[in-house]
């Protein structure tokens, strides 16, 4: 009986994980295009973020609504490439009705390896990003050194930014 329950559980997990491969492929293509838009400094990058969308960057002062983020990023988008994120791994999940999608990804960036998570909603036949948070991945083995660097920086220079 235990083996039967285990087999059923494993089968159910496999079915849930691959419940909608078409949607997962569409989501991956959308997020890949979004990253490509930034890599090629295409203004369409911001069209993929919901008007009420939030972008949280790596600095603790970086929390923007879409239009604030667009204004901040304007100088970056005047170059050939604003920034380039290469996806190393992405996990995609969705609500039962497929209207809300969330994902996490591991990225190779100009800052080194970063992690990000995002929330999207369906908008007709497409999607829009409603929340995205980018974080630098700090190996646990050097975490205390990084913590000291941040503390020393804040004590010396102060943290001039504030939450938005």
Residue map of PLM features:
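Positively charged n-region of N-terminal signal peptides that target proteins for export
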Residues: 1-4
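Hydrophobic h-region of N-terminal signal peptides that target proteins for export
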Residues: 9-18
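Surface-exposed, charged secondary-structure patches
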Residues: 20-23, 70-113
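Short, aromatic-enriched amphipathic alpha-helices that serve as compact interaction elements
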Residues: 22-41, 154-157
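Short, well-ordered alpha-helical segments enriched in acidic and aromatic residues
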Residues: 40-57
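A short gly/proline-enriched turn/hairpin at secondary-structure junctions
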Residues: 52-64, 75-82
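A contiguous, mid-protein "functional segment" used to position or interact
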Residues: 109-144
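Low-complexity, intrinsically disordered terminal/linker segments enriched in charged
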Residues: 131-164
């Amino acid at each position: 009986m235990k083996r039967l329950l285990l087999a059923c559980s494993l089968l159910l997990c496999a079915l849930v994980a691959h419940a909608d491969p078409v949607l997962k492929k569409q989501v991956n293509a959308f997020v890949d295009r979004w990253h490509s838009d930034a890599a090629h400094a295409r203004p369409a990058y911001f069209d993929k973020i919901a008007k009420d969308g939030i972008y949280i960057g790596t600095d603790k002062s970086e929390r923007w609504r879409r239009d604030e983020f667009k204004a901040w990023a304007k100088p970056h988008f005047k170059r050939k490439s604003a920034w380039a994120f290469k996806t190393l791994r992405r996990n995609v999940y969705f609500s039962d009705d497929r209207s809300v999608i969330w994902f996490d990804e591991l990225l190779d960036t100009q800052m080194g390896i970063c992690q990000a998570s995002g929330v999207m909603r369906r908008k007709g036949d497409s999607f829009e990003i409603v929340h995205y948070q980018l974080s630098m991945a700090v190996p646990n083995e050097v975490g205390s050194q990084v913590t000291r660097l941040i503390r020393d920086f804040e004590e010396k220079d102060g943290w001039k930014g504030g939450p938005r």
